[in-house]
Amino acid sequence: MTKFPRWLAILVGLLFPLSALTQQQGLTIDIVGGNTAATPIAVLPMPYHDSAGAPATDVSGVVAADLNRSGQFRTLPLGQITERPTHGSEIRFPTWQALKQDYIVVGRVLDARQGTYRVEYELFDVRNGKRMLGLAMTARASAMRDVAHQMADAIYEKITGLRGAFFTRIAYVTASGSHGAMRYALMVADSDGYNPQTIVRSAEPLLSPDWSPDGKKLAYVSFEKGGSSIYIQDIATGSRELVSSFRGINAAPSFAPDGHRIALSLSRSGNPEIYVMDLVSKQLIQLTNSFGIDTEPVWSSDGKFIYFTSDRGGRPQIYKVASVGGTATRVTFQGNYNATASVSYDDKKIVVAQGSGNVYRIAMMDQSSGSTVWNTLSTGSLDESPSFAPNASMVLYAAREGGRGVLYAVSADARVRQRLVSVDSDVREPAWGPYRSVH
């Protein structure tokens, strides 16, 4: 049977059944799998050098966890660390060469007074002893995880040449309670699932969160008025704007790269079609006009094209149309079900929910080499809603395990997975946010 889009499942009552659950708390996190071919790196403990109270955050532990879950690095286990230098001048490189480490990170945490801490760290190439990075950052105790994520980003970029995406955020929806008394929440958290923040609470379903390019707002679908409506909400202030509540379906908002427009799916003229809305004038441009269901639009990085899901050919596939209108062309040809596309920053990779029979997994279409290569990234049977990290090194997606919804973040080579689970609610509808500005 052809799988319905998420918003259509809501409308016809096809939501997965939920057991009785209480209101959500934070996510529990664990790493699944490992990459033996990853680059070995030793991230040494960074002790606190002062008599005042130490920060609660284990900075080096967060850095190591970030690098591990990227799939590009394999950090040396603490039990195998035989020496613990905190300055580059203290490193004995033959020790780390014998441990077959390519890189080493050392550092220390200092009291910077007035409730702040200073983290100093260095990155070295073990093979030649060259210092590749030496930086210091100062922050309050509450921001030490942010500091650690930024450190991991800097290390990742220095070694790989690609900007890190650890200092980013994710959005997702939780669902708790039982039928007749369901509660939904739109949440925002750090990229590793820590520091969850509730953005919206509702007794009606919430769907399809999408980040503005500056990371300050979220567009989403709410059913609080009975039918579907699209809102845009400011994360910091909580203020929100109703932008689409036309008769029929209002679904799948997607911010343009310029932040001034959204693409969306509307059934105001009959079948669900793809539109573009100017967020100032609210003027609509209709891009598609087919006999099938056109939904789940997502923009190319330059804003010139929109990818979307359509069953105009009989089964759901990904199509592409110019953002100013024109003839749509089919993009996916492998498999009889491809939906819910997410496009990489360079437009060379697309991840989709790919179905075969009753099994739905996350697959990536990679055109980086000039030819089309498909890889399956997930291992479940009901995996959906993939979302690229801003550097395309990881993919966030939703899955079903034991009758409940969980999230996974998988490395682009599929070798490392991070599972994000709420102890008291379903987790679904993930969206990876853009790069955050560093102040």
From Swiss-Prot:
InterPro entries: 6-blade_b-propeller_TolB-like, PD40, Tol-Pal_TolB, TolB_N. It comes from the Bacteria. It is found in: Periplasm. Residues 1-22 form the signal peptide. GO terms for cellular component: periplasmic space. Keywords: Cell cycle, Cell division, Periplasm, Signal. The keyword Membrane does not apply. GO terms for biological process: cell division; protein import. Disulfide bonds: none annotated. Its main location: periplasm. The Tol-Pal system is composed of five core proteins: the inner membrane proteins TolA, TolQ and TolR, the periplasmic protein TolB and the outer membrane protein Pal. They form a network linking the inner and outer membranes and the peptidoglycan layer. PANTHER family: PROTEIN TOLB (PTHR36842:SF1), PROTEIN TOLB HOMOLOG (PTHR36842). Part of the Tol-Pal system, which plays a role in outer membrane invagination during cell division and is important for maintaining outer membrane integrity. Belongs to the TolB family. This is Tol-Pal system protein TolB. It comes from Xylella fastidiosa (strain M12).
